[in-house]
Amino acid sequence: MNRLFCIAMFAFCAGFLSAQDVSWPEIGLDAKPAARWWWMGSAVDKENLTRNLEAYAAAGMGTMEITPIYGVQGNDAKDIPFLSPRWMQMLQYTESEASRLGMQIDMNTGTGWPFGGPEVGIEDAACKLFVTEYRLEGGNTLDQRIEVADKKQKPYAKLERLMAFSDTGKCLDLTDKVKDGMLCWKAPKGSWRLIAAFCGKTLQKVKRAAPGGEGYVMNHFSARAVKNYLGRFERAFDGKFKDTAGGATAYPHNFFNDSYEVYGADWSEGLFDEFLARRGYKLEEHLPEFLAAGERSDKTRRIISDYRETLGELLQENFTRQWTEWAHRHGAKTRNQAHGSPGNLIDPYATVDIPECEGFGLSDFGIRGLRKDSLTRPNDSDLSMLKYASSGAHIAGKPYTSSETFTWLTEHFRTSLSQCKPDIDLMFVSGVNHTFFHGTTYSPAEAAWPGWKFYATVDMSPTNSIWRDAPAFFQYISRCQSFLQMGQPDNDFLVYLPVYDMWQEQDGRLLMFDIHKMARRAPGFIEAVHRINDAGYDMDYISDNFIRTATCRDKKIVTSGGTAYKALVVPGARLMPADVLARLLELAKEGATVVFLDRYPEDVPGYARLEQRRTDFKGTLEQVKKLGNKQGKGKTVFFGTDYVRTLAQTAAIPEAMKTSFDLSCIRRKNPEGYHYFISALTGKDTESWIPLAVPARSAMLYNPMNGVSGKARLRQKDGKTEVYLQLASGESAILKTFTEVDVQAPEWKYQTAARGAVELSGLWNLRFVESAPAVHSVPDSVALGSWTDLSFEGAKTTMGTGCYTTTFVIENPASAQDWLLSLGDVRESARVRINGRNVATLWAVPYCCSVGQYLCPGKNTLEIEVTNLPANRIADMDRRGVKWRIFKDINIAALGYKKGTYAGWEPVPSGLLGPVRIIPLKITKNEMQ
C-alpha cells in the first residue's frame, strides 16, 4: 500500500516538474527592456513624471535610467539644477511612482557625459601633459623662465619634472633647482637638452550638461578627485544641503557611467611617481624616447606601452573600483561602459556590477524583405566589439550584460521596429541580456509634437508612431531576456586579449579603445574572433589579470568568477608577460587545454628588467613548446595556423548551426541541460536537421515573437543529438535541451505550405484610425501599395495608422491543418484582426502569422491596421518652416553631427504594400528520423 502510494506520488511529481520545466521562465523586472531617460534641463514636474512613467509601464518597460541633459529654449524658469533640493524631491517622487508601477530607477552619476560639473575645481579637473624644451651649452645658465608655452595653461600648469639630457647620454633631474620659475643651474660641459614636463589641464567641460551639471570634467586617474566628486552625491542623497526639505532620498537601483570620452586626458598629478612604483623605473629619465616623433625604436615602444598600462591601472583603481565600492556602500550597483578607456577593457568591465556595451549604427545582414534606408550609418559595434562587455561579465561571474541599444540606426524619425530586431538579436548572441534603449526623452503633455527630443537616438517614446506597436517588440525582448538571464554562460573558449601588442604597436601616446576606432586598434584580434566564431565556437575574452587567477578543475579552466571553459586560446599574440605565460604552462600541466594560433608569443612587453624577464620567458616558452610537440593522449598544448583543424583537437564541439547553416546563436547551461538563443541573421531560410554540440534526450522550442512553445523533434545520429529546425530569414527561436529527461509537452508544429494559396489582390477599403495631420477624402477602395502614392489630402505627410479591410472566402478551413497569413511588405508594423478577433501584432520580417483558428467557413473579414513612420510628417513641418528644433546645445543634429533639415526628404513608403496571401499549411509528421 505504502509502496504503491510512493510510486503514484513520484509519477505525479514527475509530471508536475516536467510541466514546470517546459514553461517560459518568469519575466522579472530586469528581463523587461529598459531605457535611458533624458531629462531636458531637468524641467520635470510630478504630473508629467507620472504621465511618462505610466506610459512606459503600460508598454512593458522595466527600468528607466535618468540622465539629465541640456534644456529647452525659453524654458529656463522651469529648469531644476542637478542635485538641488528640488531635484532630489523630483527624484524621490520618481522612485516612488516607479515602485508603484512595478518599475525601478537607475541614474547617471552626473549629467551629460563624462563625469564632471561645478563641484570639480581646477585642481580636480582632467589633466594633460605639456612639454617645454630648452637648449643650453656647457658653462651657461638659462635666462628663460621655466614655464608652459601654452598661454591658456599658464594659470594651471604645474611643473612636474625638469630633466636635462646631454649629448653624451647623461641625465640629470633639475626639478629642485627651479626657484620661482627660474633655473638656478650652470650647465656642465657639453650640449644639453632640457625638457620641462608640466601637468596642465584639458579644460574639457561636461558634454551636453544639464543645469547644475556644467563644469570641468574630472580627473578619472586621481583617487582624490573621484572621491571629491562622489562626495557631492552623498551630501545630496543624505539630505545635507541646508535648505533640503523632506530628508534623505533613496539611492537608485544602479548608478550609470557612459562611454569614456575624456578627450586628451593623458596625464595626472604624481604620474611620474606612480609610474616608478608600478613599472620599476623612472619615466622622466626617458623623456626623449617618450616624446620622440617619427619612426619609433623598440625601446620607445616599450616605454610607451608601460605608460599606457599605467594609465589603465590608475583608471581601474582610482575611478572604476572606487566608484563601484562607493555605490555598494550606499546599497546601489554600477553599470558602466568601459569602451573608450585607455586600459585593458576586460578589467574595468569586470569590475562593475553590470558591464554595458554600445551599438552605434545599423547592421546589414542581408535579411530578405527587410526595408532599406539610404539615411543610415553602418554599425561600428560588430560581434567582436560587443563581446568585451559580456566577456567581463561572464569571467567575473556577473549575471547581467547591458547594452546601449539603437544609437543612430538611421536618421531621426526613420527607424522602424523591423530594423531594430536584427541589431538586438546581434546583441543577444553576443551575450547581452539586459537591454537599455538609447533612448527616450521626458516630454510634458503641453509640448507640441514631436515633443522634447534628443539627438542620436531611436526615440523609443510615446510621441513616436512606432510606439503604438512597440509593446509587441517589448514582449519579444522580455521573453528572450527571461531565457538569457537564466542559468550560466556556456561559451567554449577563453580568448586572450593581446593588449600588449596593441599598446606597443599603435602610434601616439594616449591610446583609447573607443568603438569607432577598434578596427584600426585591433584588426588581427578582430579577424581571429570572427574566425573562431565561424568555426562554430563561442568565446569570452580574458585579460592577463584574470589568467593570473584562473584555476584548472576537471580539465577545464575556471575563472575567478566561477565560469568554466574547455580551453584558453591565444590568437597570434606576440607579446605576453612572463608570469602570464608561466601561468598558462601551469594550467596545461594541471590538465587544462591551451591553444596557440598563428604563432607562439615571442617576447615580453615593457622596458624594466627586460633581459631578466626575457630569460624567464624563454625558459617557460621552451617548456610550453615541448608540451605542444607532445603527441598522443594527454596532450594539453596545441599549436596551429588552421583554426578549424587546430580547435577541433580541443574538447569543444563546434555548433553546426553556425558552420553549416549560417545561423547565429549563444548557448547557456541550466540545471536540466542547455538553452540556446538562435537567430537567422542571414538572407537564407533554414529547414533541416541540425546537429547540436551538446547531448539531449528531449528539447523544447520557444517562439519569442508570440509566446508559442512545443516539444522539438530530436534524433540521435552519428553520436550526436540533432534537432529539426525551421527558421525563415530574420526569424529567431529559443531551444531548451534536457539532458536526462524526456519532457512531456505538446509537440512543436512543424508546418509546410500546401497547395491552394490565395492572394488577396483587388481593392481594399482604407480608413485612418489615427492620423496627424488629419487626412481627408480618403478613397473608399484602394489597391495595395504605399498610401503616399494616393491622391487624397495628407497622403504624403501624415503620420498615423491606416486600417485596410477586405473579405475573402474559404469554404472549408478544416481542409488544411492550419493557415498562414503573409502580409508581404509592411510599412512599418501591423495589427491583424480576422472576423473581429485580434490575431497578432506583426512588427518584423517575415510579416506572417498563423490564422487557422480564426477562420470560419465561407466569408471572412480581414482587417490590418498599419502604422507608418513619422518621417513624412516631420519633413512636411520642415518644409513649412515649423520651429520644432527648440533645444539648447547641439539641438538636433543629423547623422554625422551635421546641421540641416529634413525638408528635402522624399515621401517614405507607408502602409500595406503586400502582396497579402492566405496559405494553407500542413503539419509534417515525424517521419524524418
Show which residues each predicted segment covers.
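Aromatic-lined ligand-binding clefts that engage carbohydrates, nucleic acids, or primary amines
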Residues: 691, 808-835, 843, 862-866
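Mature N-terminal segment immediately following signal peptide/propeptide cleavage
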Residues: 20-63
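Carbohydrate-binding surfaces of carbohydrate-active enzymes
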Residues: 34, 45, 49-50, 63, ...
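Acidic/aromatic-lined carbohydrate-recognition and catalytic surfaces
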Residues: 69-177, 185-187, 191-194, 198, ...
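Extended acidic/polar, glycine-enriched regions
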Residues: 154-155, 161-238, 716-751, 755-756, ...
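Short beta-strand segments within Ig-like beta-sandwich modules, predominantly Fibronectin type-III
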Residues: 714-716, 839-843
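Bacterial Sec-dependent N-terminal signal peptides
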Residues: 1-21
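An acidic-aromatic loop/edge-strand motif
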Residues: 112-122, 128-129, 134-161, 165-170, ...
